[in-house]
């Protein structure tokens, strides 16, 4: 039964063909037939080797239509900044006591923000938060005094990205229930952010391949001209 379902959703998708973005979105949405609202993910193969510091690709993008998922945000802050975080809608706010909770292995959040003065404490959590991609970092706006703005961005559709060892960067950019236009706008916003994050050490073609897929569906390769600038 499962094999037949997999075969059915793969029908009509040629893994060797490149599709226009709008067509690819339609194909992915049609094949998102699971009993839950599948996440739509975009992946980009880049011409970089992240083992070299000058070829690291990292950044954050605010998707115009959000991600469709509820994001739990933790904020490490004291005093007025802690109050600001709570007022902005942060799910968990604390200082030393929150550090101890996380050190104990309880991570009940998806995104982590810290004020600069908290980083000596939060730095102790590198081994816990680092592997999960949650360590606050000023480069992606999660170490900041603008706590309100950071919390609202995280709740509203901010997506962090970081290239992996194989030169791939990927992210969930919406749900199958989104209309095609919303998904297209989110994909373009993500691709633009990745292109703008092109490192100085990147040589040759920067964007090599772009594909989208749903949680349970096949990947659909996209014509680069559909999503990237000519010089990408």
UniProtKB/Swiss-Prot annotation:
One Gene Ontology CC term in the entry: cytosolic large ribosomal subunit
Keyword terms: Repressor, Ribonucleoprotein, Ribosomal protein, RNA-binding, rRNA-binding, Translation regulation, tRNA-binding
InterPro entries: Ribosom_uL1_bac-type, Ribosomal_uL1, Ribosomal_uL1-like, Ribosomal_uL1/biogenesis, Ribosomal_uL1_3-a/b-sand, Ribosomal_uL1_CS
GO molecular function ontology, one term from the record: rRNA binding
Gene3D superfamilies: 3.30.190.20, 3.40.50.790
GO BP annotations listed: regulation of translation; translation
Function according to Swiss-Prot or TrEMBL: Binds directly to 23S rRNA. The L1 stalk is quite mobile in the ribosome, and is involved in E site tRNA release. Protein L1 is also a translational repressor protein, it controls the translation of the L11 operon by binding to its mRNA.
Quaternary state and interactors: Part of the 50S ribosomal subunit.
Family: Belongs to the universal ribosomal protein uL1 family.
Protein name listed in UniProt: Large ribosomal subunit protein uL1
């Amino acid at each position: 039964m499962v094999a037949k379902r997999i075969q059915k959703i793969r029908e009509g998708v040629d893994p060797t063909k490149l599709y226009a973005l709008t067509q690819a979105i339609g194909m992915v949405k049609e094949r998102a037939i699971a009993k839950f609202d599948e996440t739509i993910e975009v992946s980009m193969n880049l011409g970089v080797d992240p083992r070299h510091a000058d070829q690291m690709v990292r950044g954050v993008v605010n998707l115009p239509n959000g991600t469709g998922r509820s994001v739990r945000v933790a904020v490490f802050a004291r005093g007025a900044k802690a109050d600001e975080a709570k007022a902005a809608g942060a799910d968990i706010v604390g200082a030393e006591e929150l550090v101890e909770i996380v050190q104990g292995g309880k991570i009940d959040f998806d995104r982590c923000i810290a004020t600069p003065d908290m980083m000596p404490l939060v730095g102790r959590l590198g081994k816990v938060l680092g592997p999960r991609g949650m360590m606050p970092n000023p480069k992606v706006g999660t170490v900041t005094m603008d706590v309100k703005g950071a919390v609202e961005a995280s709740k509203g559709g901010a997506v962090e990205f970081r290239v992996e060892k194989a030169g791939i960067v990927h992210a969930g950019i919406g749900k199958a229930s989104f209309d095609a236009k919303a998904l297209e706008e989110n994909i373009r916003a993500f691709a633009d952010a990745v292109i703008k994050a092109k490192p100085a050490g990147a040589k040759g073609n920067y964007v090599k391949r772009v594909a989208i897929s749903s949680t349970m569906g096949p990947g659909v390769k996209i014509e680069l001209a559909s999503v990237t600038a000519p010089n990408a």
